[in-house]
A protein has these predicted regions:
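Short glycine-centered segments of the SAM/dcSAM-binding site in methyltransferase folds
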Residues: 71, 164, 249-250, 274
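Adenosine-nucleotide cofactor-binding segment
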Residues: 161-170, 180-240
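Helix-to-beta-strand junctions that scaffold the AdoMet/dcAdoMet cofactor pocket
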Residues: 245-246
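Rossmann-fold dehydrogenase core element
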Residues: 250-252, 263-303
Length: 334
């Protein structure tokens, strides 16, 4: 076994601190990867602070992993049952027995998984991804979560040229959603509660910007969109945005508010609208997304930080003070 340097949360109320542990020896189908960059996802904060009720401590977060060597990536999971219908269909994220998370998971031998806030990782080759050398290195890691989280549902609902797509919320997920929807040929509108986001939305490629607090603007957008990709994790009123959908329109939910949301039946029934959720993507689709990004030169907008800045980064994420994703340079941990 090899000693790995990392940062870990020892409990839900403690900051992340240096932590050493042993990675398993590579098996016949494993690859040992030296981690170059790891993205910081908002879900890392939820898990490290025990907010979802399933945290395993000590915890080494990080599921947006980009490595040196053959330019390899590791995303949100490192194993699944491989036998159920979903796994066989390339939907490992919906594995009937549960995917094995890159961190805060349990391997088949009962050992906990530790993530990418570390210098290296050992992963089954079936759960690694190829990354093109055409892409700027620092912006790749967030594609493995924020990227696939937005790419997958847009592909699932068949977004195409000429569709009217709204992206609700301009953050780590929202900025990737704009890039993908534009690349698919859609007419894209950014819906935001912050006037300061207009310039960034336009820079990212959005064709329109709508301030959600402007009643006249929102009224004018009723029955307008084919798809709304809802990336907002703060508590908000879904019904307001359902009314912006055309007949047969779909709201895709990828943000997770802290409390249950209220849905009335009439906005759905009267225009045959629908709401769906979506969780990351399978290995095949994630590879497809990475190849698409290489073809269209799509990466995440990032701020690169050192490992010892992680606790400050968490606080800044909670204040929406990052444009639009933190990425840890793991060279700072060696």
């Amino acid at each position: 076994m090899s000693i790995t340097k990392a940062y870990a949360a020892q409990g839900a109320t403690t900051p992340l601190t240096p932590f050493n542990f042993e990675r398993r020896e590579p098996g016949a189908h494993d690859v040992q990867i030296e981690i170059l960059y790891c993205g910081v996802c908002h879900s890392d904060i939820h898990q490290a602070r025990g907010e979802w009720g399933n945290s395993i401590f000590p915890m080494v977060p990080g599921h947006e992993i980009f490595a040196v060597g053959d330019l390899a990536g590791v995303g949100c999971f490192v194993d699944s049952c491989r036998e159920c219908h979903n796994c066989k269909e390339g939907l490992e994220q919906y594995c009937d027995t549960g995917m094995v998370g890159t961190y805060n998971g349990v391997e088949k031998d009962g050992t906990p998984t530790y993530g990418g806030y570390s210098t290296q990782i050992v992963v089954d080759e079936k759960y690694t991804l190829r990354v093109s050398d055409k892409l700027p290195l620092t912006g790749v890691a967030p594609l493995l979560c924020a990227g696939i989280t937005t790419y997958s549902p847009l592909k699932h609902v068949g977004v195409k040229k000429g569709d009217r797509v709204a992206v609700l919320g301009l953050g780590g997920l929202g900025h990737m959603a704009v890039k993908f929807a534009v690349a698919f040929g859609a007419e894209v509108t950014m819906l935001s509660s912050s006037p300061s986001k207009k310039a960034d939305a336009e820079r990212l490629g959005a064709h329109h910007f709508a301030l959600t607090s402007d009643e006249a603007t929102m009224k004018g957008l009723q029955n307008h969109f084919d798809v709304i990709l809802n990336t907002v994790s703060a508590q908000h009123d879904y019904i307001t945005y359902l009314n912006l959908l055309r007949t047969n329109g779909t709201m895709i939910v990828v943000g997770v508010p802290p409390a249950p949301v209220q849905i009335h039946a009439f906005p759905l029934i009267m225009q045959r609208r629908s709401i769906i959720g979506s969780l990351i993507g399978g290995i095949k689709e994630t590879q497809e997304m990475l190849d698409f990004c290489a073809e269209h030169n799509i990466v995440s907008d990032v701020e690169v930080i050192k490992m010892d800045y992680i606790n400050e980064a968490y606080e800044r994420i909670l204040k929406s003070d990052v444009r639009y994703r933190f990425v840890i340079d793991l060279a700072s941990l060696k």
